[in-house]
From Swiss-Prot:
Main location: virion
Topology feature Virion surface, residues: 17-579
Membrane topology according to the record: Single-pass type I membrane protein
Post-translational modification: Glycosylated by host.
Protein's name according to its UniProt entry: Glycoprotein
Gene Ontology biological process: clathrin-dependent endocytosis of virus by host cell; fusion of virus membrane with host endosome membrane; virion attachment to host cell
Assembly mode: Homotrimer.
Membrane topology (Intravirion): 606-662
Naturally occurring in which organism (per UniProt): Tibrogargan virus (strain CS132)
Transmembrane segments annotated in the record for this chain: 580-605
Amino acid sequence: MEAITIEIIIIILTISYPILVAPQLLYNYPFNCKKGPKMTLDGLTCPLDFNTFNLDSKDNMEAGTMCRPNPLSKDIEDGFLCYKDTWVTTCEETWYFSKTVKNHIIHEHITKDECFEALATYKLGKHVEPFFPAPSCYWSATNEERATFVNIQPHGVLLDPYSGKIKDPLIDSDNCDNDFCVTRSHQTHWLRNRKPDIMERCNNETWECHPIKIYYGWVSKKKNQETSTTFNYVQTGLVIESQYIGHVLMADLCIMTFCNRDGYLFPDGSWWEIKYSLYHAFTKDHTVLNNAHKCGDRTHGDHLTEFQRDKKVGYEDLEINLEGLEMRQKSRSINMMCLNRLAEIRNTHHINVLDMSYLTPKHPGRGLAYYFSQDQKNSSKYHVKVLDCDYKLIHIHDADIKGFVNITKYPEPNVTILGLKDNLTFADLGISRCQDLTPLNGSRNISCEESSGPLHSDDSRLSNGKRFWTRHSFQGANFHEHPGVRIGVNGITYDIRKQILRFPSTSNLLWDLPSYYSTKHRVHFFQHPTKHEIRKNFTGSDSRDIDVLDDLINRHINRTDFPTRIRNWIGNIEDKVEHFFSNVGGTIKTIISLVLFVIGTLISIKVWKKCKRHPQKTKKVAQLKLNDYEKTYNQRDTSNNNNDDLYETIENGGTVYSPFHV
């Protein structure tokens, strides 16, 4: 068999690798945007890699079409978030009537039965909004009041009509028990209300269609012989190529019936009906597509076994193409960079415009659009909000390799929708032209046109008859840190002073990166629906900081609660006593301390003086006693001497006296 060379020329890698062919850029732009779900950190995910090629082949190929139902605005499935909170109020009162009130919220475990019971109550209009119980304070005691509420919040989700699964950043669709799903918020569940009717999609006159090319792939086989090396080529199977879906191997498809029509489920999860004429290469085997297995035969996207590979119509090892290999390696690198960025965002809660481009969907269809929102109550903090949009590939004419478009240099229209040939202006995309009229050293003065894309209520239709609106597609906003620059969805920026639009991607941001693309912004993600409600309802006009709101859950805040005007006269007395002790308590303590210090000092001095006099008195008494003793002793000696003289005198008289003498 003669070798047939298939030359694949890379034109575009949609968002990831936009390459200019003539001066134009292919960009995945959001249309028909609606308010999206409340974003959480866990809901941020990296998009699916998506490659598109343009085929230049000398082999016979078949031209065909691929069609599918249009994504409908009714693909939103009604549902509710269900969670149980215990709102706790604690009052601690001291002996001198000083009170400290603490509020905190505890997320309780909730069962499926409790959720459905609360949903029935909600539909009857008897749902009670949560609140903190009134504090009950008792003298020299700590008292706690609790109130438990089962909360129900409406939360519509995007439904994948082909798989019947939910696509929502808050809900784990793989962890659902019928109509009861686990969410990524703590102790929070999602309840399905009703499934939408899919019969409206089955009218094929309203389906969207795109041209495709189908051809056989070839693989070169190297055979080493003793004297030489030869190459032969083996036909592997069918390849389908479209600038809308990229270059897809038939080995990656499986058969799936939708709307009672046979079609194929693609790797990105989309369903398409493939139509082609049976000529040339396919006349010899026009049933080759029917050899594919049904989607239920294997988990879609898993690696094929050898047995399954034998039953498929193509192989993954198409003819080696260095450009294609290089692009796949770059695609993997971009995906790794996105994962690293995502880890950094979750750890630091900081995000920049460049990060937005990594999160942007890479293929047409339903997807989320990300944009910054500055906190109205604290301009130093930002939120990341999302829109639920229908993405379409558009040609942006006269854009350079950096993604720049000078909107004053080229005449409008400058945009063409791929496959539909609809010519649009930038105003049709929702990007209003603005002028910076700010004088030197003056206050900011920016004037913009009123038209910012068609509204949902307008009768704006494309050439295929489908309605479209872009009033919220750009969602541009001005920030104090970046004067003269409007930052829109997915990192699209509008430099008003230079009149330059920039459509960012993960490849063209490597050139001349402006400082505002890399500036980190502190972003806040509400991780639980309770915080949304507190922020919206509980605080009212209070400009309480977001970080304080975080402390309301599983922690507490302290505040002194004085008696109000409706308290009785006993409460007023308590208030006065508390006020008195609060103001003079410190002074009284100081005075008492000084008095005690003075008294202690005086006592110490007196004791010291007494101790100083006591040793002298003791010495004098001892001396006196010694003198008396010596005097007595001397007297005794004198008396003895006198007696001796008496006896001597008597004896000397010649007469001796004897008492016994008769």
